[in-house]
Amino acid sequence: GGEWFTLGFMGNFQFKLNDPIRSTELGISAGLSIPSILFIPDKLFITNVPRTEINIGYNYQNRPEFTRNLISLSYGYNWRSGERFFYNLYPLQMNIINLYNLNSSFYESLKDPFLRNAYRNNFDLGSGATVYYTTDASTIPQNSFFYARWTNDIAGNVLSLFNSSLPVDTTGARTIWNTPYAQYFRT
């Protein structure tokens, strides 16, 4: 026992009276948290309650500048070591972003390459890990405390091993399901 199932819905509607311009965002997410580490021996986690996390989500955004669909899937583990260290390890993280009806003047107004990249189709398959340390892990700390978090994400490197068999789009990017895949390491 001890499994947790979560189901979330979200919605956002923006409009002005007597103005035809509207913005809509809708989303759904589901998650299953299992109180053990699947596919890894539990004896490695004797002093804590490890959990396996499986999550899936969908988000739809319709704005005057663009329409975007986002699909996410993740599989991972979280556990703690003692009272102060917490760990998340996600061997599988996948995000698919499909953008259409992009307003060209809106896109051209984006000067920052990071922002421009947020408005492109993208297939992101990778892994991630987080280590979190705190001097007070209580739910409601009574005193000042310190915390530090270190996160790493890596994507696309395994996919790059198959570059020779992947199709190429008009920009020269390798694609999966007609969508360029991301390749990066960030910390």
Predicted regions and their residues:
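Membrane-proximal, glycine/serine-rich, low-complexity loop/turn segments characteristic
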Residues: 1-4, 21
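Transmembrane beta-strand segments of outer-membrane beta-barrel domains in Gram-negative
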Residues: 8, 12-14, 20-187
